[in-house]
Amino acid sequence: VAITTDQGMEDVARLINNVSPNAAYTYIATGSASTAESATQTSLGAENTQYGGQRQAATCEYEVPFKSKWEILLSFNGPVSIREIGLFNNSSAGRMFMRHVYDETMSKVSGQNLKITIYYTMVRV
């Protein structure tokens, strides 16, 4: 399960009452760090920057009921290790809405593809 960061929580609160909302979160980044998720994090531990593993604009959708969906298809042209993903509001730097660390590292090589889909579901508690 991913963690919503403090930046993400702040931006949702700003968006719903239109008080200085930040840019939409439309970019998915991958990285290789295994540091546990924390609400105070503002970036990935070790973001991938080459060979097809770098940050990409996502296809964004709304699904009923109450789900936001982001999806990218990565096509690798060299070796990439993926252990973490994050959702950002800019193609470089920017604010991080959420971060997830996988249990194990995925090792990808040239010629392989990987589809990443992120869902964010609003729930009542």
Where are these regions (language model features)?
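Small cysteine-rich, disulfide-bonded extracellular modules of the LU/uPAR three-finger superfamily
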Residues: 1-83, 89-125
